[in-house]
Amino acid sequence: MELMITLSLAAVILGIGVPAFRDFGRDGRLTGAANEMLVTLITARNEAVRRQARTSFCSSSTPDSSLAVCDASATQGYIAFVDTNGNCQREASEELVQSMVSHTEIYQRDNMDCIGYLPNGFRVVIDGQPANAHAVFCDKRGIAKVKDGTSHSYARGVEIVSTGRAAVTRLYDDINLWAGGGTPVTCP
């Protein structure tokens, strides 16, 4: 009898705990991916100010290589480099400041093919582009609101404003707008 009660209690605890633990792991992966991007962006900006030179941040299909170059469609990682000629393409002679291998795919990038930083730390805004750039990280849960009474999304978003400041957010309204403003989203 005692064994039956113990097994029943264990089944209830596992039934409640395992799904919550799975979401905890997923949340950690998304937060980690967004923070990886944020660290590389902050490094690019800080190096521009420290060196008084233009730097750039971009996606790369070979971020773990000393010959890493920019690739707008890449999801393997990011690089930050001293962009001496200001063309947002890393040349062999341009110093690699930081590289980061990403372990999570980005669902959506908006205006993030290349983020350039000026020596004053401000972002280079190319004519015709919006002042802010965004990236959305999500998993199979999509960008839906977390059902906990907050305005948080399951997804994570990174925003870079024209002043060069980058930040991570979980706010559903922002992420929904960046991911297509109500258009159905298919996440990896």
Residue ranges of predicted features:
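Residue-level micro-sites within transmembrane alpha helices that shape
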Residues: M1, L7, A44-N46
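N-terminal helix-rich module
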Residues: I16-I42, N46, R50, R54, ...
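Alpha-helical hydrophobic helix detector
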Residues: L3-A20
